């Protein structure tokens, strides 16, 4: 099996735009509410829930920690809904995404999310399951429920991708 190394990039709205939304207050529209006592950072992600009898779900995922090197052997996507991950412990995490290549994901890209950033994967975006760093971490996850199966998995057979370091280049 051939192994190709991925370089970790810093997570920015511009770099992540083809895959979804970076959830952060920086650059967000600010609205004062509750008689000016609360700052509301408005409309941070595009939540999608398509299909039959759908609704948004709010979950907490507890991710086990990963240490480098990390081998990316598979990816998944959700054809009927977006999926958002917002860290609750303020710890950084890795985000691995790929464009669609027709028969599966294209070459993945790896991003390092700060502990004050979340991500929202748009529908049909290939991504690796949760990659918490440092220690076990909790994430608020906004997901989709509905009748249709909302999970497709792809396992790389000819080669894998490796993240040698969790630091950005």
Swiss-Prot record:
Q: Does the keyword Lyase apply?
A: yes
GO biological process terms, semicolon-separated: allantoin catabolic process; purine nucleobase catabolic process
Q: Top-level EC class, please? A: lyase
Cite the EC number.
4.3.2.3
Pfam families documented for this protein: Ureidogly_lyase (PF04115)
Q: Does the keyword Lyase apply?
A: yes
Pathway per its UniProt entry is: Nitrogen metabolism; (S)-allantoin degradation
InterPro entries, alphabetized:
RmlC_Cupin_sf (IPR011051), UAH_cupin (IPR047233), Ureidogly_lyase (IPR007247), Ureidogly_lyase_bac (IPR023525), Ureidoglycolate_lyase_dom_sf (IPR024060)
Alphabetized HAMAP family for the sequence: Ureidogly_lyase
Q: What is this protein called?
A: Ureidoglycolate lyase
Species for this entry: Brucella melitensis biotype 2 (strain ATCC 23457)
Gene for this chain: allA
């Amino acid at each position: 099996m051939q192994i190709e190394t991925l370089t970790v990039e810093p997570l920015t709205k511009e770099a992540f735009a083809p895959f979804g939304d970076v959830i952060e207050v920086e650059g967000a529209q600010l609205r004062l509410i509750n008689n000016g006592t609360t700052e509301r950072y408005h409309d941070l992600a595009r939540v999608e829930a398509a299909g039959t009898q759908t609704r948004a779900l709010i979950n907490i995922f507890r991710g086990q920690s990963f240490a480098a090197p990390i081998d990316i052997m598979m990816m998944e996507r959700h054809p009927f809904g977006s999926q958002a991950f917002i860290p609750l412990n303020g710890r950084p995490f890795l985000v691995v995404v790929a464009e669609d290549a027709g028969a599966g994901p294209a070459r993945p890209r790896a991003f390092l999310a700060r502990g004050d950033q979340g991500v929202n994967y748009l529908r049909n975006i290939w991504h690796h399951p949760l990659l918490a760093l440092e220690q076990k971490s909790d994430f608020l996850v906004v997901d989709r429920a509905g009748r249709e199966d909302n999970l497709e998995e792809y396992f790389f057979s000819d080669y894998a991708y490796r993240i040698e370091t969790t630091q950005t280049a």
